[in-house]
Amino acid sequence: MLSQVATPDECLRCGACCAHFRVSFYWAEAELMEEHLVEPLTPVYSCMRGTNQPEPRCQALTGEIGKEVGCSIYAVRSSTCREVQIADEQCNKARLAHQLIPLIQVSPADSENDHDYDQVS
């Protein structure tokens, strides 16, 4: 399967996770969020408005998926949003659903030349 190396700013171009999953969280996390962006699910859980439907898209998501996006509540986003990490399973599942190439994470140690091999000069 084709994949690409994740860059630090990849999330600013993607946004697929914000338009693929229901973003539910413990109700108290919503206290710092704008009220119109949150809807109750159960007595103890809430979700981001726009994500509890067949074709979810978080109302806090701005921009165009795969081009340039942002989160209007990034500083106070839920723990659910914070858990999704670039190039993890959830990230790539959402990217594939939006016809975006999956990402791979390359650690700096893995990307350095292997000392067992001759370097091309």
From Swiss-Prot:
Keywords: Electron transport, Iron, Iron-sulfur, Metal-binding, Transport. GO terms for molecular function: iron-sulfur cluster binding; metal ion binding. Transmembrane segments: none annotated. InterPro entries: Puta_zinc/iron-chelating_dom. Pfam families: CxxCxxCC (PF03692). Signal peptide: none annotated. To E.coli YkgJ. This is Putative ferredoxin.
